[in-house]
Amino acid sequence: MATPSNKNSKSHKRNRRGHIGLNVPNIVLDKTTGEYRVAHRVSPSGVYNGKQVIEK
């Protein structure tokens, strides 16, 4: 069974984990409503790619 050869300090451990990070969502400006929304998703008004896909 594998065992650690040296102790990893708290700072080394946190530095390693600090590179993992979080991804920022891709937010775009909606042309029809002028509001921000997540890219490649239907807007709350039901418009996607300039076309009405969900009737309200």
From Swiss-Prot:
Q: Which GO terms describe its molecular function?
A: structural constituent of ribosome
- Write out the biased-composition intervals (Basic residues): 9-19
Where are the residues of the annotated region Disordered?
A: 1-23
The record's Gene Ontology biological-process terms are: translation
Q: Which GO terms describe its cellular component?
A: large ribosomal subunit
Keyword check for Nuclease: no
InterPro entries noted in UniProt: Ribosomal_bL32 (IPR002677), Ribosomal_bL32_bact (IPR044957), Ribosomal_zn-bd (IPR011332)
Q: Which domain of life is it from?
A: Bacteria
Keywords assigned by UniProt, alphabetized: Ribonucleoprotein, Ribosomal protein
Q: What family does this belong to?
A: Belongs to the bacterial ribosomal protein bL32 family.
Q: What is this protein called?
A: Large ribosomal subunit protein bL32
The primary gene name is: rpmF
